[in-house]
Amino acid sequence: MKMEEMDLEEDVLDVVDQEASTIVDILCEQRDNVLQRIFALVDARTREQLQHLPNNRESISGLVDYFRTSDQHTCRRFLDIIWSFCENIPLELDIRIVNLAGSTAGALVNNSHVPDTENSPQSRYGKRARLDQVQSYTNAVKSFLQKKFEKVTKDIKKEVCLNNTWLCWRTQKYARVRDRPAKSQEGEEVSLEHKESVEALLMKTGRVVMLSGQAGSGKTLLMHCLAHHWAQGSYPSIELLFLLEFRQLNLISQPLSLKELLFRFFLPSDEDDEQSEAVLNYVLSNPEKICFIFDGYDEFGARFKDPKELECSVNPYQQLPLADLLSALCSAKILPGCTVLVTCRPRDVFDLFGSSDYFVAELLGFNQQRVKEYTQEYFQEKGCEIKERAVSLLMDSHHLLSMSHVPGLCHVCCVCLDHFLTSDMSQQPGTQLPTSLTQIYLHILSAFISRCHGCGSSDNHTPLLQRYRVQIAMLSKLAMDGLENSRIVFPANELTTELMNFGANAGILSRLDLTCGDGSRRLGCAFTHLTIQEFMAALHLMTNPDITESQLKKKLNLKSRWTAKTDPKTVFTDSLHLYMCGLAAEACTSNLVLLKGSENARAIVLKRQDAVLKTLQRFVVSGRQTGPKIIELCRCAHETQNIDLARAIGPRDRFELRNIRLNPVDIDALAFVISSANQMVCLDFGACYIEPECLNIIPNCKNLEELNFRSRKYDDKFAEALSGILPKLQSLKQLHFISGGLTNIGAAKLFKASECCPQITRLNVSDNYLTDESVKKITELFPKLAKLTSVILGKNNISINGIFILAGKMAAFPNIKEVYANAKKKEINVQFSANTTNSASTDDLNNTEESKQLILNDWNLKWTNVHNLCPMLRGCSSLTVLNLSHNALGNRGLKKLLEHLPTLDTIQEINVSDNGVDMDGVVLLSPLLCTLKDLTEVEASHNGKKMLVLTFSSSIIDALKQVTSEGCDILHKKLSLTHSDIHPTDMNKLCKNLIKCPNPLNLDFSHGTLKDESTEKLLKFLPNMASLNLLNLSHIQMSTDSALLLVQLLSDCQRTTTVELRQLGETFIKFLQDKSEAATCKFNQYRLSSANLAKLCEILEHCHHLTDLDLSSNFLKDEDVKTFVQFLPKLQISGSVSLNNNNLTEVGVLYLLSLMHTCERVAAVEVSLGKEEQQDIIGFVQKNCTGKTFRLSSCTVQSQNVLFLLNKLATLNSVQTLELRNNSFSADTIKYLITEFCGDCNHRTIRIMEPWIKGEAAVGLVQCCLELNPNIKEIRVEKTCLKLSVESLVSATIPNEWENGNCSLSAVHCISFDDCEVEGQHLSSLQSALRNCPSLQELHFSQLTMGADGAEFLSSVLPSLKNLKILSLSSKGETEDEAVIFALQHAQKHLEQLSLAHHVIKDRGAAVLGNALQGFTRMRSLSLLKCLDWTATGGRDLVRGLVQCHSLEEIRLDSIELDEESIDCFAQGLQAMTSLKKISLNKTISKEGSGVLCLLASLHPLIELEEIELIGLRMGDRGVEELVKHIPKWTRLRKINLSENRVSDHAGEMLVKALSHCRALQQIHLFRNNLGHSSAAVLGQVLPSLSELTELDLSENQMESKGCSSVCEALVSMKALKKLHLTSIGTSDLVNVASCLKHCTSIEDISLSWNNCENDVVLKLAEVLPQCSKLKRLDLEANNINTSGAMALATCLQFCPWIEVIRLWRNPIKKDDLILKDKRLNFSST
C-alpha cells in the first residue's frame, strides 16, 4: 500500500482501537525500560492500579485500553514511543504509524529521548518511502505466488486441504545407519513421533524444517498451497515468503549473493534497484519475519555444505556458490532467526548438517479412506456408475490399493482406471487390471496419448502406441539423456516444437518459464514427474536399437535405502531399475513390440527381457543381501511378475528388515515373493517405519510362521492395527512385539486377536509398558492356545503381584512347566509343555505330567510373601523346583517355607540362596536332614548367606537307590557347608543333630575356616557318627596340629579307610560302615618340622592296617628323611611310602638307599631329583615279589660321593633291578658299576640312560660291557638307553667252549642296537667281542645305515656266530646296501628269522638272497619290507629261493613288486607252506595288477592261518569271492585286514558271513572300501558271536545312518572291544553309536572323525564317557562341533582322568573359554 493512497487524516485513536490486540502482543515482548517510558505517560493513580494487576499481559492490556480512551495528543505520544523503541513491529502497523507521524510531523511533541536524526521529518519520510517499497514488493510477491498456485493446481481434481494433510515430527535426527559399519543392519532406532497437519508448518517461525516425503507424496503442491495461504493472509507473523524451486536453481552455475538470488531468480523488482535494496534491508533487519521455502532438494544437483566448513558469519552481499549460500541460510550463518522450509525425499534428510537447530517432519501418505475419497472426487464428473465401479476396482485390487497410499501414485491409478473403464477395455474378454507399477505406467502412457488434442487419426485400427511410437521414442531418448546427465529441465531448443506440443498436450511434459544464470527468461519443459521421466528412460533402454546388452545390465542394479554422506547425489527416485524389471514382464512384451516396430521386434524384445531376468537371477545368488536390498529385490521380482524369480528369492527362513521405511508397495512385493516360496518364513521388522496400511497386506504373505516387531514407535495404535490382521494369519506360530510402546490397552487387543491364531507357540511382548493388568489378561489366553510353548513378559512394569498371578496359574494349568521371573535381569518367562491341551481342570492329574519349576529371583520377597505364595502352590502337582534365591526371606522366611513342605509333595529342589539366612538357619535344617525321609541334601555356603539349596529324592533318584543285603533301601544324604567360618558352638549343634542320622551321610566343610577348637569338637563326635561316609575338609585354613588330630582317626576310629590332608588343597576322610581292613594316609603340602614328623610317626605306629603313606610336598630335608627312615621299620605299612617333591639332596638319597639294609620289608626305592618334579617312592614287599629294585634319576652326584654310592650299591645283594637315568654318569663310572654290581653273578637287570649313549660311544660301551662281564645274558641299546641283564653260570646255558675251559667267552644271547645313531663304520670295534660270543642267538640292527663298513663287519662276524637264529637289519631310509645282502651268504644255515627293511636290492642282490634262502632250511619267519629296485628277473630269482623255505610260519612281503610269473611261482610255493600262521602281502602286486586271484586261490591249504593282511591289493568282488571259499576253514584266525580293496557292499555281505566261522577273531580292518548298509546289517548280526574281538575299523565306507544303526546293535554285546574306528562313514547321525559305547567296557581308542557330527553327538558322548573307564583316545576331527559342545567335553573330562587326549582339529570352536584350557583337548597338530 503506497503512501499516496493512504488517508492522511486517519484518526490516531481509531488506529489504536483497531490494532489494540496487535499492540498488546508487541508490548508483551518488549524490555522493561520501554514499558517504563509508556507507563510514564499515565497518571500516577492509574499507573499504580495497572502495575498491581495479576500478570504482565493484563497490565499491558489495561494500558492499551487507557490510551484508546485518551486524547489525541497523549495517544500520538504513545504511538511515537512504540515506533521509536519497540522491536518486531508488523510491516502494516509500522506503515500506519509512520503515516500518522508524517501527516503531523510538526505537531509532534519535542521528544528529548529520541535522537534528532530518527525523530526528524526527513527520517520519517525516508522510512515511510522504504516501507512503501517493501509493501509494494510484498503485494507483488503475493500476487506472483497466487498465480503460480493457480497454474500448479489447474488439473487437480480435489481441493488441497492443509488441515487434512498430515505429517509427523521426528523428535531427533534419523540414524545414519551405514556410517557405522559395526551396526550395518541393526542401526539406531528413530525416536518417537507426533502427528500434525501441514498447515502447522509455518505457524511457528524462526526454525529450519526439513519436510521429507516419497516421490509423489505431494510436497511441491503443498508448498505452493502454503504460499497461497500466506498470500491470502494466513501466517501473519511472516511478512515476506520466498518460494524457490531447486529444479530452477539447478540452472545457476556461477556464484551469487543473497540479493541476486531473490531479485534475479525469484521475483525481480518492477521498480528501480532502490526498491530491491529497500526490500533486502528490510529482510536483513527483520529475519524473524522472513520465510524461505526451497522445494525439491532431491532435484538439486549439489549437496548442502557442512556449516563447520563455512565462515562463522557470512556477508549477505558476498557472492557464494549456490550450495554454500543455501547452506548458510539453513545454518543461520545468514539471516539468523528466519524461517526455512526445505522439502526433500527421506534419503536426503541427512544432507542437512547441524545440531538441534533444525527439525525433521515426514509427510504421511493416504490411508484407505483418503484413497477412496480421492478416487470418488476424481470420478465425480464421470457418472455414478463409473465412479462406483472405479472405487470398487481400486479397493478390491490390493496391488492398486497398495500403490495408492502415495498421493501421486493414487492419481496415476485413477488415470489408469479412467482409461481402463472409458476405453471399453474392461469389457474385452481376458483383459485384467495391471498388476505392477510398470504396467500401470504403460496404461497411463496410452491414456495420456488417447486424450491428446490433435492426435486424432482416421486409422482407428492401429494401436495408439504403434501410431505414435516415433514421438514416444523421441521422448524416451530425451528422458534417457536427462537421466544420464542428471537433468530434469530441458530448454525448448533441445526438442522440436511439435514434440513439445505433443508431450505437453498428452500430459507427459509440462512447459516451464526458465530463469537462466544471467537472469534472462526462456521457455523450457520438464516431464510432469520424475517417475514419468524414469519410466520413459526405461522404455528407451528396452526398445532402442542402439542399446547393447552390456549397457542394459549396467543400468540394472539394486539400490539400498540406507544412506550415507558418501553416497553420490542423484536427483532421481532410483526407480529406473524397477521399470526395467517391470518391462521384462511377459504382460509388457506386446506393448514393447509395438514401440519397437521393426521386423524382428519380438525377438529383440524377448532377448532384452531375458537379459534383465538373468541379471536379477545373478543378484539372487550373489550372496547375503541386506534388508533394504532384499526389499528392492522383491520389488524387482514383483514388477516382473515372474514366479520362478520369486521362488529363487523366497527360500530363506527369515527376512530381517532394519531402520528403513516400508510402504504398502514394498509389503505387497514381499508378499508376492514369500507366497511363491514353498517354505515357512519369519518377517522381522526392527525400527522400520511401517505405514498402518502395510499391515493389511501382511495376510497376503502365505507361509508366514513368525512375526517380529521391535521398536518404540510400535505403540498401542500400531498394536490395534496389527490385531485387525492377526485372525487372518492362520499359519502364525510366533509373535514378537518387543521393545515397543505397548501399554495395557494395546496389549489387551493384541491378546484378544491372538486367540484366533491356533498355531501360536511363542508370544513375546517384552520391553514394553505392561503392568499386572496385562498379566491377568494374558493368563486368560493360556487355555485358548493349545500349542503355546512360551510367553515372554520381561522388561515391563510388572510387580510381584503380577508374578504371583502367574505362579497361581501353575496349579490351574497343568501344561505350565516353568515360571521364571528375575527382577534384576528384568526377565519374565512362562514355559509350557508341548502337545498338552490347556485346561483349567485339575481332575485326574497323574504322574505322567512333566515336572514344573517356579523361579522367582531378586524380588525382595519376605516371609509374608512366602506365607501368601505357598497356598497358591498347594494344588500344583509335579512342582519339582522352587527357586526363591536372591530375595530377603531370612531365617523367618526359611522357617515359614519349611512349615509348608508337607504341601509340596513332589518337590525335588528348593533354592533359597542369597536370602539373608545365617548359621542359625543352617542349624535349623540339620535335624530335618535326619528326620525328613525325602530330604537328601542341604547345600549351603558362606554360613548360609549365599548358597542354600535343599534337594529332595525323586523318582529318578529312587531308581538309583542302593539296596542292602537285607533288601532295605538306603538313601544317601549330604550336608555341604562350604566357604563358612564354623564356630565351635555351631559345630557342636550341627554334630549333635547329625549324629542321629540313620542314612549314609557325607559332610562337606570345604573352602572354609576351622579353628582348632572347632576341629576338636568335630573329632569328638566323628567316632560315634556311625552313618558318616565322607568328610570333606578341602581348601580349609587348618593348622598342622589340627591336621595331626585328624590323622589320629586312623587309630581312634576303626571305620576310617582314607585320610587325605592337603593344606589349602583337596582334603577328605573316608569311612566304611564296618571295620576297615586297609587304610591310606596322605599328608601333603604342610611345612613339617622334625618334631611334627616324629609326632606323625608316633600316631601311625598305632595304625595296624595302613597300606599307603604319602608325605609329598612337605618341605622335608635330608635330616627329616633320616628321622623318618629311623621310624619306618616300626610302621606297619604294606604298600608304599611317597616322599615326592620335598627338599632332598644326594645325602637324602643315601639315607633312602640304606633302607634296603635296615628294613627287610622294603622292596623298591625310587628316587628322582629332577628340577621340575622330585620323586621319592618306597615300595614294600608284596606277594610273589622276587628281589629288590632301586631307581635313581636326575641326581647329579658329586664326584666324592660317586664311589661311595656305587660301593653302597655293590653291597646290596638283594637288589635285582637297578635303573639309573640321567645322572651324568660317565663311561668309566658305568664300567665300574658293571664290574662291581654284577660281579657276584647273581641275576641282575641294569638300565642306564644318559644322553651320550649313542653312535660310536654306544658301540664302545657295549664292547666294554661284554669284555668286563662275561655273565651278561642280553644287552640292548635303544636310543640313549643301555639295558643289560646278567645271569649266573648255573642258570645260563653252557656252550661247548665253556665246557672246554675257555672262560674268556661271553654268555650273551642277544645284542640289539635300535635307533641309536649307530652306523656301519662304528661296528668294527665290536668284531673281536662278537667272536667271543658263541652263545649269541639274536642280532638286531634297527634304523641304521650299514654301508660297506657294515657289510664287511657282517661278513666278518656271521661265520663265527654258530648259534645265531635271528638276524634283523632295518636300514635308515631306503639305502642301496647290496653288499649287506651279499654278507648274508656267510650266515649259518640254521637261521630261523630274517628281517630286512628299507633296503634297495637290485637283481644281483635278489639272486644272492634267493640262493641264500634256499639254504636256510629252518627258516620260520621272513620279513622283506619295502625292499625295492629289482626287475622281473630279480623278482623271479628271489621267489624261487623263498618258496623253498617250507618251514615258514610267517611271511611279510609289504610294498614289493612282483611280475605275474613271480606271483604264479609264489602261489605254488605257498601251497607247500602248510605251517604258515601269519602272512602279510600289503600292496604287493605286479605292475599289471594281475595275479591276485591266483594268489588268493593258493591260500586254501593254509588251515593254520592266524593273521592275514592284504591291504591295497585291489582284489575287488572277484577276489572276495575267491577268499570266502577259504575263510571258513581258518578257525584259528585272529586278525584280518582287507583295507583298500574296492570291496562292494554285496561282496562285503559275503565276506562278513564267512568271518562268522572265525570265532577267535580279535581284529577286523576293512577301511577304505565300498561297504554299505547291507554289509553293516550282516555285520550287526555276526559281531555278537565274535566275543574276543578287540579292534574294528570300518572307516571310509559309506554305511550311512541305516548301516550305523546295525553296527550299534552289535556294540552292546562287544565287551572285549578296545579299538573302534568309524571315520568318514557317510552319516553325521552317530548319537546311537555314542550311546552304545557305555556297553563297550574295555574300549580304549575311538575315532568318529570326518563325519560332520553336530553337538548332539558330543553331548551324548559327554554323558557316556564317564562310564568308559579304560578309554585313552577319542578322535573327533573335522566335525561340526562348536564351542558349547567342546565345553561339554571339557566338563566331562573332569570326571575322566583316564582319558589322555580328545582330538578336535578342524571344528568351529572358539578356544577363549578357560574351561577349554585342558591340555587333553587337542585343537591343532602343533
UniProtKB/Swiss-Prot annotation:
Subcellular location: Cytoplasm
Cross-referenced Pfam families: LRR_6 (PF13516), NACHT (PF05729), NLRC4_HD2 (PF17776)
Keywords: ATP-binding, Cytoplasm, Immunity, Innate immunity, Leucine-rich repeat, Nucleotide-binding, Repeat
InterPro entries found in the cross-reference section: Leu-rich_rpt (IPR001611), Leu-rich_rpt_Cys-con_subtyp (IPR006553), LRR_dom_sf (IPR032675), NACHT_NTPase (IPR007111), NLRP_HD2 (IPR041267), P-loop_NTPase (IPR027417)
List of residues binding ATP: G213, Q214, A215, G216, S217, G218, K219, T220
One GO cellular component, as annotated: cytoplasm
UniProt repeat feature LRR, residue ranges: 879-902, 904-925, 1002-1025, 1026-1048, 1103-1126, 1128-1155, 1212-1235, 1351-1374, 1387-1411, 1421-1443, 1447-1468, 1502-1525, 1532-1553, 1560-1580, 1588-1609, 1616-1637, 1642-1662, 1670-1691
Domain (NACHT) ranges: 207-537
Classification via PROSITE patterns: NACHT
Claim: Cytoplasm is one of the keywords in the record: yes
Example of a GO MF term: ATP binding
Chief place of localization: cytoplasm
Domain of life: Eukaryota
GO biological process per UniProt: innate immune response; positive regulation of MHC class I biosynthetic process; positive regulation of MHC class II biosynthetic process; positive regulation of transcription by RNA polymerase II
Protein family per UniProt: Belongs to the NLRP family.
Function summary: Probable regulator of the NF-kappa-B and type I interferon signaling pathways. May also regulate the type II interferon signaling pathway. Plays a role in homeostatic control of innate immunity and in antiviral defense mechanisms.
Name the record gives this protein: Protein NLRC5
Protein species of origin: Ictalurus punctatus (Channel catfish)
